[in-house]
């Protein structure tokens, strides 16, 4: 981190706890570090160098966890810690992100399992369990977390006859945790992970001051990908016009790639079925995998794309231009480590495990990576140019995550926006097409420190100072 990523202020550590499945998201013990990774002293040492984001997988635990084992043995303090099957509970409308059974029988007890038979949902209805979860949250802060990512938080509260998704009680739990953190650790931020349509996603801002400090900008990855595949920025531009500043204490968590796939649900109301199908076709062509959902009429629709973002786009030039969009956008940008290091699809991992998401979860060997950053032209180009962009952005106050943003319309081959904070102003322009574009605009490009005369080469990007 110190050697190769000096310009990152924060690091998101994916689940670092003992686990039994789902690459870490089936946690056995919230408060132990997986010995394969080190121990708490390693985490605390890293927290001295960078701000850290911890994952709080509060919706579910591994069936091998001590808490669940105590539930199975009917320990008095854990008898309601998880959700048992109740024939009077109407779960017919429950939102399902998986095709696996909603209830799983484990040692004679049928329990709620949203994501898999190994991941048992916690019962936030139980005051004792909610108190335990709250203690975990506060322990993470004590251990050095600067941000807490609430994984799958939208599923937390279950209620008969509802979707058991985004329920008011879930929002109340987040408000409780936000109040505690604002009082006890005001510099710690809550980030909600809800990969759902945009209106539902931004509901986790609450009033802008009482729930999430940041929400994931889930429409951004598929919309940017669509722009480069089609050579047309219209959908991205029109959606971006709806994104406004939230408050002085809340903003967007922007990203293009992550350990998960690229979700298409967030753009169901933004892109047409045909446009989403076209993205899926391009992903398949570029070696990726597509997960489909069944529709009521018997048809299928793509809902998640499993592919490395560089492989999806096809070239280093497109990846760099895409990240110029990411780094310009209102909010806090987050770059997946495989993106800055120029990784491509890990087909071997998919073939060996049969798990589609492994295509973008390659575990890199440090010495091999360091050698390739020098000897592999694509890795070297991406790493050096993205690192340069980060250095420039770091010193530009107009990119303040709580500043203003105005989307500009320079035609469908370009995505452009104006960023403003205080007296600092700049215009970011990205050519998302394979054509030369000429604009009636000139000024100093702060990336290259040269005068931009109005001509953009294919996939070229500029940040024009207006000061």
Residue ranges of predicted features:
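Active-site and adjacent substrate-binding regions of carbohydrate-active enzymes
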Residues: 1-440, 454-467
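Solvent-exposed beta-hairpin/edge-strand motifs
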Residues: 442-451
